Regions:
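Glycosyltransferase specificity loop/lid
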Residues: 1-153
Length: 153
């Protein structure tokens, strides 16, 4: 549980801290609730890797100082595609006609996300992700979690 300042207040010393990876869709209606959930998990002593693109991460409010050590912002650069406007990393940055192109660029994050999971799993106990939380747009990410024996939702 968190105190008024966001500091962690443990309700049970027997609870094992988890490492949760959260990778929301690249829209602020998904990013902001995902970040709020990340901070709630961190306030309960869990470690969170919050994955998005560099520009989206830069536009999010920073976690409170007491939680910042437990919330790792992981930047995966969105691949550039012909026809996709420069800097278009969120659906806010796009006309609706470019939505499918944005999804195609997003699919280009499959290999970098897998590499991130490989690195996180290689760090061993305490750093290895326990859970990967995904949006429905991540049709390739569940397989990446399964391949590494990480639970996903």
């Amino acid at each position: 549980m968190a105190g008024a300042d966001g500091a962690v207040v443990s309700s049970s010393s027997r609870q094992r801290a988890m490492h949760v990876v959260i990778f929301p869709w690249l829209a602020f209606g998904h990013l902001l609730p995902g970040l709020e959930f990340a901070q709630r998990l961190a306030s309960r002593g869990h470690r969170v890797s919050f994955v998005s693109t560099p520009r989206n991460l830069a536009r999010l409010p920073p976690p409170p100082p007491a939680l910042a050590p437990r919330v790792d912002l992981v930047a995966l650069p969105l691949p550039r595609l012909d026809g996709l406007p420069d800097g278009a990393e969120s659906t806010n940055d796009l006309p609706s006609a470019a939505f499918e192109l944005h999804r195609k660029a997003f699919d280009g994050l499959a290999a970098p996300f897998s590499a991130f999971l490989d690195a996180a799993c290689a760090q061993g106990p305490g750093s290895r992700p326990d859970w990967v939380l995904l949006d429905s747009f991540h049709h390739w990410a569940a397989a990446a979690a399964v391949d590494r024996k990480v639970l996903h939702l």
